[in-house]
Amino acid sequence: DYYENFYEDPDEIGASYHAFIYDLNTDKSGNFYFSQSGYKSPLTGGVVKVSPDGKSAEFIGTDLRNPNGMGIGGPKDWITVADNPSGKAVYNGFFLAKKGAYYGYQKSRTVPMLVRLPASVDSSSGSQCWSHTEKWGPLSGSVIHTSYSQCSAFYCFIQDIQPYPNGFAVRFPFNLDSGAMRPRVHPIDNQLYITCHKGWDTTAPLDGVIYRFRYTQEPVVGICDAAVTHSGLRLTFASDLESSSVKTSALKAYKKDDSKKGPEPLAYKLGKVQLINSTTIEINILDIEKESLLNRTDENGNISVNAPICLEYKLKSKNGSTIEQTIYATVNSLPEEKTKD
């Protein structure tokens, strides 16, 4: 074997057990990326970009505490990163890494969460990756997100609109035996592989597991796309829906903000639920415009983190299957209204 050290970080790593260098990714141009801890460490917490020849490096976003995972992919070669905001995080998920951005550890946040999850669902995130654009059935092109703490994996949809995209996450119905950390799509079989680990702050019973998530060609009935509308949410499913099951009583929407103590989650008032076509429904959520980024940004550009809309639904597909899932919707932007000629 041949090993070559073509880049060496000039910063001291430090003796703290939190002074980690995390993950390793490349973009389409061959640049390397990794994240590093800023907690109990002499390092600057951030995402580091290294040139293909290893001769230069720069930060792509700083002010990160303990960014265990990141990812690169999608049609725009987006860089995602997941931080752990505290030892007992009140939320988690992931956001986009951008040069010059701050993420709320020691400074005010200037970039919102792309996907936020309640701590009961994910309190310590791993990495992300993009599923194959064609070889993964109805979930092709979705973003895969991992939870180290809750031993779970999620498939996510991104609505790429201005000023900042909206994100939607659905948990795979599998309880993993170890903390999910590093997802990758195999270049030969195009299926998803996740390496898992057990350390502190995880529900994992086992130390070290590798999983394969594969598309079996069997019919899929669950959700396969989502979007924010001016009046609520639009959900698209992978199979035809039984129209009689599409009704308000089959859905429950609430905001679960684990950063605030309270007896019950804040319930959303649902309006009309419409069947747009055989696979798509639109749910009217009153005052959804209050969730937008414009209402969470102060005059200095600082952004508050908003709890996701948790939407539970129990529907029927025309083949008789029950579709019972929860989608976590992170609303940042509303689409532009169409003007009439």
Short names for language-model regions:
Residues 182-183, 282-286, 296-299:
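Exposed aromatic-hydrophobic patches
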Residues 277-283, 289-290:
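Aromatic sugar-binding surface patches on proteins
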Residues 295-302, 309, 315:
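Cytosolic C-terminal regulatory domains/tails of membrane transporters and channels
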Residues 137, 240-247, 289-294, 302-305:
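A short beta-turn/strand-edge loop motif at beta-sheet boundaries
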Residues 234-274, 311-319, 326-329:
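Short, surface-exposed alpha-helix to beta-strand junction/turn motifs within ectodomains of secreted
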Residues 38, 160, 198, 239-241, ...:
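A mature extracytoplasmic/lumenal domain signature
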Residues 1-234, 243, 272-275, 279:
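Beta-propeller domains with acidic blade repeats across secreted/periplasmic ectodomains
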Residues 217-222, 310-341:
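Acidic, Ser/Thr/Gly/Pro-rich low-complexity segments and short DxT(G/T)-type signature motifs
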